[in-house]
Amino acid sequence: MASSIVSSAAVATRGNGAQASMVAPFTGLKSTASFPVSRKQNLDITSIASNGGRVSCMQVWPPINMKKYETLSYLPDLSDEQLLSEIEYLLKNGWVPCLEFETEHGFVYRENHKSPGYYDGRYWTMWKLPMFGCTDATQVLAEVQEAKKAYPQAWVRIIGFDNVRQVQCISFIAYKPEGY
């Protein structure tokens, strides 16, 4: 009989040790059911997401002979003062200006394949080298004028590169040939 008492005591001791190391569940968060909730009964069907009455003033961009090229292409041609303002913004952000030109297609086109690829008009010819260290917007504008003079039937765009992140940050058309 003594052996059975010792045996049950050993089991009880072992059971108490395991229970002492257990962690109680966290009960610090309260249920949201105890908080009062006020809900607005919205039975008005006109409050469903819509564009309201603005449907009549939306227009579709006419795709025939009015292609979009780059950023700001929906605006009229930029004047020299407006170009200087954009170039100053580019320089103020610490981006490196670079000029590119395209003599045949100033827009994305696909002649080699139906799906997008490397040769679909996104890559233009670089005008000289990127203007590293340029701090004067008039220097960039002078290069635009020189590119226009050399290639009067070409599109000229200004690009701003961030040489720290190594990405293109801005790109806009500075000159379009007559008729575009």
UniProtKB/Swiss-Prot annotation:
GO aspect biological process, one term? defense response to virus
Where does this polypeptide localize?
A: Plastid, Chloroplast; Cell junction, Plasmodesma
**InterPro entries (alphabetical):** RuBisCO_ssu, RuBisCO_ssu_dom, RuBisCO_ssu_N, RuBisCO_ssu_sf
Q: Which PANTHER family match?
A: RIBULOSE BISPHOSPHATE CARBOXYLASE SMALL CHAIN 1, CHLOROPLASTIC (PTHR31262), RIBULOSE BISPHOSPHATE CARBOXYLASE SMALL SUBUNIT 1A, CHLOROPLASTIC-RELATED (PTHR31262:SF10)
Subunit note: Heterohexadecamer of 8 large and 8 small subunits. (Microbial infection) Binds to tobamovirus movement protein; this interaction seems required for viral systemic movement.
Any further remarks? Answer: The basic functional RuBisCO is composed of a large chain homodimer in a 'head-to-tail' conformation. In form I RuBisCO this homodimer is arranged in a barrel-like tetramer with the small subunits forming a tetrameric 'cap' on each end of the 'barrel'.
Instruction: Please describe what this protein does.
Output: RuBisCO catalyzes two reactions: the carboxylation of D-ribulose 1,5-bisphosphate, the primary event in carbon dioxide fixation, as well as the oxidative fragmentation of the pentose substrate. Both reactions occur simultaneously and in competition at the same active site. Although the small subunit is not catalytic it is essential for maximal activity. Involved in antiviral defenses.
| Gene Ontology MF annotations | ribulose-bisphosphate carboxylase activity
Does the entry feature the keyword Amino-acid biosynthesis, yes or no?
no
- Domain of life per record: Eukaryota
Keywords, comma-separated and alphabetical: Antiviral defense, Calvin cycle, Carbon dioxide fixation, Cell junction, Chloroplast, Host-virus interaction, Photorespiration, Photosynthesis, Plastid, Transit peptide
| SUPFAM superfamilies associated with the record | RuBisCO, small subunit
State where the transit peptide lies: 1-56
Q: What is this protein called?
A: Ribulose bisphosphate carboxylase small subunit, chloroplastic 4
Can you name a GO cellular component term? plasmodesma
Q: Which family does the record assign?
A: Belongs to the RuBisCO small chain family.
